[in-house]
Design a protein with these regions (language model features):
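Beta1/beta-strand and adjacent pyrophosphate-binding region of the FAD-binding site
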Residues: 4-18
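Glycine-/small-residue-rich beta->alpha transition segments that form the dinucleotide
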Residues: 151, 156-160, 316, 329
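Extended, charge-enriched "interface" segments that sit outside catalytic cores
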Residues: 432, 438, 449-612, 616-621
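An anion/pyrophosphate-binding glycine-rich loop and adjacent beta-alpha core
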Residues: 57, 84, 186-322, 419-492, ...
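A glycine-rich dinucleotide-binding beta-alpha-beta segment and adjacent secondary-structure elements
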Residues: 308-374, 402-415, 534-588, 593
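Core beta-strand elements of the Rossmann-like FAD/NAD(P) dinucleotide-binding domain
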Residues: 6, 142-151
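Conserved N-terminal/central alpha/beta ligand/cofactor-binding core
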Residues: 3, 24-132, 143, 155-172, ...
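Internal hydrophobic alpha-helix adjacent to the cofactor/substrate pocket in enzyme cavities
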Residues: 380-401
Length: 621
């Protein structure tokens, strides 16, 4: 029998990485919030790789932290191994990645939610969702409890209509054998929300004691680690070692001989999988000429012997999985603890949302994470944070927070989703940003902490520390501009050791730093009045000096982009009544409802002539 339970300002459906950031942001902004999850024991679960960060994903985590989110702090707390990726390339693509103790991370996040003021955390499946006459929302649990809310955030991950595939076997399920959310999809369809099917997958887990490590390549963490969070004072320590192995011709042969048993190739799986994280069988088919594929063996935690086989995602039958795993060096006698699987799930066409992640035509309803068509924990957390912030700001009657492409990867991610949409699970990459030299992970605080402070997620104490750091950066920049370094044998030795041309005379320190081969640290012995500065300070100074010309060029491009973004488009504009626009442009603009001229210019099917015509029309309105 139905009964009314309680009213909230914000209800979040799902307590994965998107749901966590959404409910914490809303609660911390002072609105009464509840988060519902199917299983309280797996809040913030990592059903796929036990890691956070990576190329471009590390940028997202830093940005989440700079705005006042939780993921970076939790990742630092439960890090098993830390590595900075792409150090052989420029600073724009340097990305932090950490192996995480997945169970500890989940339990730690659950405790964070439990302690948060203004937040209730509840175990229960939401089976229905509808609008009340007063404009508020009502959700119904499987146990027939009714809850009201002014705003609802859907962050269902891969649970929504989840179905697992392993060879010929398929069944309704969420990730890691949990219950799926089967009823909510029906409620969303009643609201005319455009759902489609995507799929993702995960590799097998094997028992550590059954692995032969004797011939495997070790992959250690960095000697000098750095944290994700700008608040973490002590860098995390490396506690484990990862290992590298490779597939071979025998592995390939088994895969090719059993492709007809793959649900992906037999047509049983209809959902579109992630383009940049294909299953192992898909890699074998796509790259038939490749003799071997690199695989990583990664621990799942300190209190478990489960090892994650990164790169071996599969939906082949269990017997085939065992056969090809046992062809791989080090895994000849591996005992599989969890079988790899593919999971198909419902998600929304993200062009139905606007830049606040609220639905265009359904007020008070927001989407976040894999529900929006993205893939990855970090992408999900970023969207959850934005949805939670904007839901709370709207309830408080304040202006929304909209991040643009020139200020963050989060803004790029959301703009791509709501403007361009996606035909397969969207993954963030540094190449998706036009301004990546400005959007580095080291300066995420410079770009976003003032926004987090203005909104109310950054404390006064943290903001004061940020200002202090900025003052140190400015002072050190001024010092090296004035600092003269005389020509000495010691300086010439540094030039020689760094592989750059010798000097004919002494010069300013800033001129030395402009040389690509010379680092700030390399000049320590000839910089006699150098202050003792944190790594984060001198690295920011060094990058700004070395890439000054390129950075200024991108900053000018961002100014031009923002000039166009300032031309707002009325929400009630009728494109069909406008003259000078092609029919395709009218249809796309009417569907996506861009908020400004810049967003309109990025819509597929809207060409420069359409934008020029629209610009003229806007000036007459």
């Amino acid at each position: 029998m139905e009964y009314f339970a309680e009213s909230y300002d914000v209800i979040v459906i799902g307590a994965g990485h998107a749901g966590i950031e959404a409910c914490l942001a809303a609660a911390r902004l002072g609105v009464k919030t509840a988060v519902f999850t199917i299983n309280l024991d797996w809040v913030g679960n990592m059903p796929c790789n036990p890691s956070i960060g990576g190329t471009s994903k590390g940028h997202l985590v830093r940005e989440i932290d700079a705005l006042g989110g939780e993921m970076g702090k939790a990742a630092d707390k439960y890090t098993l191994q830390s590595r900075m990726l792409n150090l052989g390339k420029g600073p724009a693509v340097h990305s932090l990645r950490a192996q995480i103790d997945r169970r500890e991370y989940s339990q730690g996040m659950k405790h964070t939610l439990e302690l948060q003021e203004n937040l209730d955390i509840r175990q229960g499946e939401i089976v229905d969702l509808y609008r009340l006459e007063n404009g508020e929302w009502q959700v119904k649990t499987k146990l027939e409890a009714l809850f009201n809310a002014k705003a609802v955030i859907i962050a269902t991950g891969t649970f929504l209509g989840g179905r697992v595939y392993i060879g010929d076997v398929s069944y309704e399920s969420g990730p890691d054998g949990m219950f799926p959310a089967t009823e909510l999809s029906k409620a969303l369809k009643k609201l005319n929300i455009p759902l489609r099917r995507f799929k993702t997958g995960t590799p097998s887990r094997v028992n550590r004691k059954s692995i032969d490590f004797s011939n495997l390549e070790e992959q250690d963490g960095d000697e000098e680690t750095v944290p994700f969070s700008f608040e973490t004072q002590t860098p995390p320590k490396n506690k484990v070692c990862c290992h590298i192995t490779y597939s071979n011709e025998k592995t390939k042969q088994i895969i090719l001989e059993n492709l007809d048993r793959s649900p992906m190739y037999s047509g049983k799986i209809e959902g579109k999988g992630p383009r940049y994280c294909p299953s192992f069988e898909d890699k074998i088919v796509r790259f038939k000429d490749k003799e071997r594929h690199q695989l990583f063996i990664e621990p799942c935690g300190l209190e478990t012997e489960e090892m994650y086989l990164q790169g071996l995602s599969s939906s082949l039958p269990e017997d085939v999985q065992l056969a090809f795993i046992h062809t791989i060096p080090g895994l000849e006698h591996a005992q599989v603890m969890r079988t790899a699987y593919a999971i198909e799930y419902d998600c929304v066409d993200p062009t139905a949302l606007n830049a606040t992640l609220e639905f265009n035509s359904i007020k008070g309803l927001y989407g976040a994470g894999q529900f929006n068509g993205s893939s990855g924990y970090e992408e999900a957390a970023a969207q959850g944070l934005v949805a939670g912030i904007n839901a709370a700001l709207k309830i408080k009657g304040e202006e929304p927070m909209i991040l643009d492409r020139g200020g963050s990867y989060i803004g790029t991610l959301i703009d791509d989703l709501v403007t361009k949409g996606c035909t397969d699970p969207y993954r963030m990459m540094t190449s998706r940003s036009e301004y990546r030299l400005v959007l580095r992970q080291d300066n995420a605080d410079v770009r976003l902490t003032p926004i987090g402070y203005k909104i109310g997620l950054i404390s006064q104490e943290r903001y004061d520390k940020f200002i202090s750091k900025e003052e140190m950066v400015k002072a050190e920049r001024e010092r090296i501009e004035q600092k003269s370094i005389p020509l000495t044998d010691a300086l010439q030795k540094i030039m020689e050791d760094c592989g750059t041309t010798p000097l004919e005379r002494g010069c300013k320190m800033i001129e030395l730093l402009k040389r690509p081969q010379i680092t700030y640290k390399a000049l320590t012995s000839v910089d006699d009045d150098r202050p003792d500065l944190p790594r984060a300070v001198f690295e920011q100074v060094e990058i700004a000096v070395k890439y000054e010309g390129y950075i200024k060029r991108q900053e000018q491009q961002i100014k031009e982009m923002r000039r166009i973004e300032c031309k707002k488009i009325p929400a009630d504009i009728d494109y069909y009544s406008l003259k000078g626009l092609r029919l395709e442009a009218v249809e796309k603009l009417s569907k996506i409802k861009p908020e400004n001229l810049g967003q309109a210019s990025r819509i597929s099917g809207v060409n420069p002539a359409d934008i020029a015509a629209l610009n003229i029309i806007l000036e007459t309105l």
